[in-house]
């Protein structure tokens, strides 16, 4: 790494970041077990990983785990507000190129994603570790643009305009870059629901040129990170942002998937009266039987003190909903992108910045709303994201996926797949001792009776946990 091969807020924060990183390691047994298991064999020796995932303390432990088992890594954050600057500094100080600043502009965001593919020797990356599929989309859209520039001519949003401009800059600076980079990729591992959806769309359209491992639908990710992580980090973000008393407030959670379930539990545990909106009759019935009132936002918006979106879809909270809410209603998103709330529809109204990632927006009738993290992930923008322990499970999946893709790339087709069940169970097993969990062991007779081995896997792939 050259002296300039990183962009962080302040490299002097490295010592502070290192102290927190050391603490996080004690709460991330899965990642530490990976270091112990694979440090000798170095299965990622020769891997050149371009990582785009929230640059937090927990991600720093992931990065150092990948490096400890042989990988070379370049990193950016997957959200303009999610970087923890001391974490980025701690990683940069070790010689790992990292490009991440809390509060970076959208233009900088795409510049930093480009930077994770710019290795000093000029050779391409061979793996992508992604969150939201932005890094993957950058390479694939760029390679398409190298054969047809017209696809960059009509951006639909401000962010897409900046995205296209970055592609154009790279095409001019390095002709053929995207096509060469696409051809070198052995595979990608994707962290989130939103990113997995994008990858499935690419596969459906015949535009996925390499294998993709869906981390999100590993049981030890979706049923833990998405649910239990949100259960802790949502209320943390709201409290740090607003200092409001949540108990007694009426909160509406839009969506009751795994993230919605965790979010509803988070608010309910803080004493809020929680209502849920849903499009899916199965999830709606689950919410009702968990004790929540299931409502339509058109009807219920006026009752809300807090509205949280969790869906991964767009236009969930529209301008007409925001006109109905109570004065000083808190709006936040814990889904993925900033279009779950129609933030663009608010741009012509007066904004007052209260503090970083907290804005008050005033309507013509004098009503005010509090918007958290400009509609982006509030648990990372207004707080520090999920706790280390639950992220250890998610990130252990990432490490195992990167090893699979690098060492067994011929085993996977150019499609979206999940890690095999035995690895999912391995991830869970690595986290049991930390919580003092003692497993019961099947006898040979019991195992034969249900058609498994005493060592597992214990459930068929179609089992729903």
Curated annotation (Swiss-Prot):
<keyword id="KW-0378">Hydrolase</keyword>
<dbReference type="GO" id="GO:0071269">
    <property type="term" value="P:L-homocysteine biosynthetic process"/>
</dbReference>
<feature type="binding site">
    <location>
        <position position="226"/>
    </location>
    <ligand>
        <name>NAD(+)</name>
    </ligand>
</feature>
<dbReference type="GO" id="GO:0005829">
    <property type="term" value="C:cytosol"/>
</dbReference>
<keyword id="KW-0554">One-carbon metabolism</keyword>
<feature type="binding site">
    <location>
        <position position="221"/>
    </location>
    <ligand>
        <name>substrate</name>
    </ligand>
</feature>
<feature type="binding site">
    <location>
        <position position="379"/>
    </location>
    <ligand>
        <name>NAD(+)</name>
    </ligand>
</feature>
<feature type="binding site">
    <location>
        <position position="278"/>
    </location>
    <ligand>
        <name>NAD(+)</name>
    </ligand>
</feature>
<dbReference type="InterPro" id="IPR020082">
    <property type="entry name" value="S-Ado-L-homoCys_hydrolase_CS"/>
</dbReference>
<dbReference type="InterPro" id="IPR000043">
    <property type="entry name" value="Adenosylhomocysteinase-like"/>
</dbReference>
<feature type="binding site">
    <location>
        <position position="56"/>
    </location>
    <ligand>
        <name>substrate</name>
    </ligand>
</feature>
<feature type="binding site">
    <location>
        <position position="225"/>
    </location>
    <ligand>
        <name>substrate</name>
    </ligand>
</feature>
<keyword id="KW-0963">Cytoplasm</keyword>
<dbReference type="InterPro" id="IPR042172">
    <property type="entry name" value="Adenosylhomocyst_ase-like_sf"/>
</dbReference>
<dbReference type="Pfam" id="PF05221">
    <property type="entry name" value="AdoHcyase"/>
</dbReference>
<dbReference type="GO" id="GO:0033353">
    <property type="term" value="P:S-adenosylmethionine cycle"/>
</dbReference>
<feature type="binding site">
    <location>
        <position position="191"/>
    </location>
    <ligand>
        <name>substrate</name>
    </ligand>
</feature>
<feature type="binding site">
    <location>
        <begin position="255"/>
        <end position="260"/>
    </location>
    <ligand>
        <name>NAD(+)</name>
    </ligand>
</feature>
<dbReference type="InterPro" id="IPR015878">
    <property type="entry name" value="Ado_hCys_hydrolase_NAD-bd"/>
</dbReference>
<comment type="pathway">
    <text>Amino-acid biosynthesis; L-homocysteine biosynthesis; L-homocysteine from S-adenosyl-L-homocysteine: step 1/1.</text>
</comment>
<feature type="binding site">
    <location>
        <begin position="334"/>
        <end position="336"/>
    </location>
    <ligand>
        <name>NAD(+)</name>
    </ligand>
</feature>
<dbReference type="Pfam" id="PF00670">
    <property type="entry name" value="AdoHcyase_NAD"/>
</dbReference>
<dbReference type="InterPro" id="IPR036291">
    <property type="entry name" value="NAD(P)-bd_dom_sf"/>
</dbReference>
<dbReference type="GO" id="GO:0006730">
    <property type="term" value="P:one-carbon metabolic process"/>
</dbReference>
<feature type="binding site">
    <location>
        <position position="313"/>
    </location>
    <ligand>
        <name>NAD(+)</name>
    </ligand>
</feature>
<comment type="similarity">
    <text>Belongs to the adenosylhomocysteinase family.</text>
</comment>
<protein>
    <recommendedName>
        <fullName>Adenosylhomocysteinase</fullName>
        <ecNumber>3.13.2.1</ecNumber>
    </recommendedName>
</protein>
<feature type="binding site">
    <location>
        <begin position="192"/>
        <end position="194"/>
    </location>
    <ligand>
        <name>NAD(+)</name>
    </ligand>
</feature>
<dbReference type="GO" id="GO:0004013">
    <property type="term" value="F:adenosylhomocysteinase activity"/>
</dbReference>
<feature type="binding site">
    <location>
        <position position="131"/>
    </location>
    <ligand>
        <name>substrate</name>
    </ligand>
</feature>
<comment type="function">
    <text>May play a key role in the regulation of the intracellular concentration of adenosylhomocysteine.</text>
</comment>
<keyword id="KW-0520">NAD</keyword>
């Amino acid at each position: 790494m050259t002296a300039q091969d990183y962009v962080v807020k302040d490299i002097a924060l490295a010592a502070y970041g290192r102290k927190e990183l050391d603490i996080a390691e004690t709460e991330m047994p899965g990642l530490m077990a990976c270091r112990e298991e694979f440090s000798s064999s170095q299965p990622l020796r020769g891997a050149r990983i371009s990582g785009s995932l929230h640059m937090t303390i927990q991600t720093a432990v992931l990065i150092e785990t990948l490096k400890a088992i042989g990988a070379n890594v370049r990193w950016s954050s997957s959200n303009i507000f999610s970087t923890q600057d001391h974490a980025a500094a701690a990683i940069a100080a070790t010689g790992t190129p990292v490009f991440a600043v809390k509060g970076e502009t959208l233009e900088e965001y795409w510049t930093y994603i480009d930077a994770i593919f710019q290795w000093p020797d000029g050779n391409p990356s061979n793996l992508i570790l992604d969150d939201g599929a932005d890094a993957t989309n950058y390479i694939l859209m760029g390679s398409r643009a190298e054969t047809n520039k017209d696809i960059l001519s009509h951006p639909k949003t401000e962010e897409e305009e900046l995205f296209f401009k970055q592609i154009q800059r790279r095409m001019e600076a390095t002709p053929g870059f995207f096509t060469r980079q696409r051809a070198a990729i052995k595979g990608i591992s994707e962290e989130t629901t939103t990113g997995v959806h994008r990858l499935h769309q690419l596969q459906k359209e015949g535009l996925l040129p390499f294998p993709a491992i869906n981390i999100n639908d590993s049981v030890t990710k979706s049923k833990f990170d998405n649910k239990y992580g949100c259960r802790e980090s949502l209320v943390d973000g709201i409290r740090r942002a607003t200092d409001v008393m949540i108990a007694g407030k009426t909160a509406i959670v839009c969506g009751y998937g795994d993230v919605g379930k965790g979010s509803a539990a988070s608010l309910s545990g803080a004493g809020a009266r929680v209502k849920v909106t849903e499009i899916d009759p199965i999830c709606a019935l689950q919410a009702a039987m968990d004790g929540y009132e299931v409502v339509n936002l058109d009807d219920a918006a006026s009752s809300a003190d807090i509205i949280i979106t969790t869906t991964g879809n767009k236009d969930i909270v529209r301008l007409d909903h925001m006109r109905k809410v109570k004065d000083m209603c808190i709006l936040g998103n814990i889904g993925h992108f900033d279009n779950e709330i129609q933030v663009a529809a608010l741009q012509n109204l007066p904004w007052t910045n209260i503090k970083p990632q907290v804005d008050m927006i005033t309507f013509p009738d004098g009503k005010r709303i509090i918007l958290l993290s400009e509609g982006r992930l509030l648990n990372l923008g207004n707080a520090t994201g999920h706790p280390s322990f639950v992220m250890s499970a998610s990130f252990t999946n990432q490490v195992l996926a990167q090893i699979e893709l690098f060492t067994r790339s011929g085993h996977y087709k150019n499609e979206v797949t999940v890690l095999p069940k035995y690895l999912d169970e391995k991830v869970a097993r690595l986290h049991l001792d930390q919580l003092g969990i003692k497993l019961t062991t099947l006898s040979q007779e019991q195992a034969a009776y249900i058609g498994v081995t005493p060592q597992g896997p214990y459930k068929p792939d179609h089992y729903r946990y």
